[in-house]
Amino acid sequence: MKDIFNENVSLKTETPAFAKHVLPAVPSSEVYLEDCVKALKRFNDNHFDLAIVDPPYDFSIGNKTNFYVSQGKYNKVQETRPKGGFKIGGNYMDSIEKAPNEEYFKELFRVSKNQIVWGGNYFTKHLPPSTCWITWDKMNGENYFGDCELAWTSFGSAIRKVKKVVHEKGRIHPTQKPIYLYDWILQQYAKPNDLILDTHLGSGSSRIAAYKGGFNFVGFEIDQEYYEKQEKRFNDFK
């Protein structure tokens, strides 16, 4: 056998077919069971390229037993417990998580270069004016929830509208958004090699979309039940 390291040996100049295409590295996907505000303090300024977040915004019903909030076609929100609490999409809750305060938004803007905030119309006191909002047409029909959801963005482009195109099965979180919505957001607003942040991971749709798109991702979820559910959902997807 010839010594291929001998300088007198001429190697073939043609590269084998399998070596012509360099396979992309598998994107990292790190999620933590942790309070996001405390966690963000560990990161340097502008550590993340794009934050896509869906914070809660103080929705509760009170203690009216068996009270139907929605009198429409689907009755998506219904009182279910004698001391209060309600159901959304099959999930029983006492109330939706408390809305984030000024400290949260201060840290969010510090650690990320650009931001997309779902429910931005509820947080106008924390967000600067923007010309670029995203409107997601959920095509809900007759029920308590709005026909659309709005997302504030830090970008300077025009308002964009996304229509519901598919109904995803396997709902694991009451405010779960579909993967295709995050697919679209990443295609429109993220750049190659961007590091994506989600402070309220919930169902993990953003995580799956980032993995599909080849983006490195960091997410936080404070609720252990939802953390475990999204972890299973992500691993099942992989």
Task: Enumerate the language-model features and the residues they cover.
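Class I S-adenosyl-L-methionine-dependent methyltransferase catalytic core
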Residues: 1-197, 205-238
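Conserved glycine-rich SAM-binding loop
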Residues: 202
